[in-house]
Amino acid sequence: SNSIENPELVEHLLSKSTQYKIKISNPKYGEKAVLVENARRNAEEALARRNSESANQAKLLKGLANALDIKDKLNRIEVYDNSHIQGTNAIGGMVVSGPEGLEKSAYRKFNIKEAAGQTGDDLAMMKEVINRRFSKLLIEDPGRKNGNWPDLIIIDGGVGQVSATAETLKELGLKDLNLVGVAKGEQRDAGKELFYRYKEKPFSLRHTDPVLYFVQRLRDEAHRFAIGAHRAKRKKSNFMSPLDQIKGVG
């Protein structure tokens, strides 16, 4: 049945939220009945797809937690990358993923203000971004109750970036956050990524492992977001470079 329980209440709520008078009808015959049936089927198919995607996302999150030996559920992953050209217009980017996939409303960009941006020091840039992000969290939510604390931090980089991040967190008194760096192998080949934990030996995943593809997508999204923010900043400063036309530069 396509009938709605308490249609008067639903009409009232919809009218209030849209500022238009909404009238619910339930046609049994004719063109309107066909439209309602088609809409119902489309909604069911969309819900089935969404449930399937959510189930797959949950499987990937669990697989990533297992790969990193993390016991807690990964409800929020933050991925960081920085973008600049020789230190100019340096930007840090943070993207977020969770059980429902990428959470674009939670993305953040950081205009790198310190001397790091002037010298092109990638490690100092990462330290500044991490310090600003988590100093703010410590002020806004010291009890970690609002769901904005990450269950996992992923850094686009190797041992240097991971060490810089871990040391910055330690200076803030944060020693319990899960952290991993992801860097391409010596040949810079996708599929041969190495995973870096603080003061541990790097390891890799099978190139066919779905978890590896998942991490690659997260890293690529962070890279895309950081480069986009960097180019927007360059454009705003009225300085564009031929390098901006080269995919992946930044």
Segments the model singles out, each with a brief description of its role:
Residues 1-250:
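Acidic, glycine-enriched active-site microenvironments
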